[in-house]
Amino acid sequence: MDKKVLFEALNTELAKKNIDLEIICVGGFVLEYYNLRGTQDVDAFYQEDAKIISIIEKVGNDFGVNAPEELWLNNSVANMNRIPSRSICEKAYSYSNLTVFVPPLSYILGMKLESGRDRDRQDAGDIIKLVKIRSIKDVTNRLKEYGFQPDLSMILEVFEIAYGMEWLAEYMTEHPDELR
């Protein structure tokens, strides 16, 4: 389902209660936003309270998109991840009572590498390929700027996913100092 429709409905419900909400989306929704793949739910960072949970639940019920154990918009990522700085995020949608931000794909890459799950490693490879990242050193430095502690073996693995083993072997031959 088009998330923009859900965000518009969420804004309408927030406006009825005179509540303003800012969210920073991460995970699958950001991949969907950049046309990489779809997702069912929206993981986001936001200030949660009972009123906001109730509004999110209502919108999800109205559109039939809540999962049995999880609302369509949830901030469970806040338990395991650091929030991206708003200064690196772009405004994806802006309504009267709702503003939706997304971090750059390079930040999502860091989150995917940190998780280490199979699906996330594949997503990380897809991000590298989409953004046409060609430097392991640049990725490592950027992730460190964001506060991640990148694992070189994981970075090498996702570059292999993105470009193949031949490309990676050639890169390592041409840039031996980057891997020390």
Residue ranges and their predicted role:
Residues 1-180:
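Compositionally biased terminal segments of proteins
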